[in-house]
């Protein structure tokens, strides 16, 4: 089915907005090593990928209806396996995934886990809203920031200040870090 000579490292294979802003093609060896040890990519087709895992192009969304065994969809098919593949001894997960993918993990969290969702928003009228394209850009940029700074302590993520975003401590909690984009 797959020829290994046609596989591309996952972190270089995806072309979505988040991956464009992550800009892995200009990473140095140290950033690739950091990502290999810390980043996990949720894939509807492959499950959990490390950045250097080889993939072949595909188009499959997590919400796709499938008939695999007793599973009616990919959420049922993957079940707890995705969670077990991302949790490590630190019990810390920094969630930069979309809601479609993060719910694959959230369902299986335990009280021992520290799960921090990163929220990117901006003021629209009198309330903060998430704008999809800008949030995707910021997710990629944040992965880049984390890798460039070799972040090991989640609190260091609060220093992220790219694309006009800054940390809002007044809106954040231990489980949710909120970053607001200031529109000029």
Kindly label every feature range from the protein language model.
Residues 22-173, 178-184:
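Internal, well-folded beta-alpha domain core
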């Amino acid at each position: 089915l797959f020829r290994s000579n046609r596989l591309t490292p996952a972190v270089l294979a995806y072309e979505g907005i988040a991956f464009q802003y992550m800009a892995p093609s200009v990473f140095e060896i140290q950033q690739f090593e950091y990502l290999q040890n810390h980043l996990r990519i949720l894939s509807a087709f492959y499950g959990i990928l490390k950045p250097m895992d080889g993939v072949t192009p595909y188009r499959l969304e997590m919400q796709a209806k499938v008939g695999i065994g007793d599973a009616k969809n990919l959420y049922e098919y993957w079940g707890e396996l995705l969670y077990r593949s991302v949790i490590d001894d630190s019990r810390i997960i920094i969630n930069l995934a979309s809601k479609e993918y993060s719910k694959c993990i959230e369902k299986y969290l335990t009280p021992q886990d520290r799960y921090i969702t990163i929220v990117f928003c901006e003021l629209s009228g009198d309330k903060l809203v998430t704008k999809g394209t800008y949030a995707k850009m910021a997710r990629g940029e944040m992965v880049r920031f984390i890798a460039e700074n070799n972040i090991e302590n989640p609190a260091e993520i609060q220093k992220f200040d790219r694309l006009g975003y800054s940390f809002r401590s007044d809106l954040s909690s231990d489980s949710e870090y909120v970053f607001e984009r200031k529109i000029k």
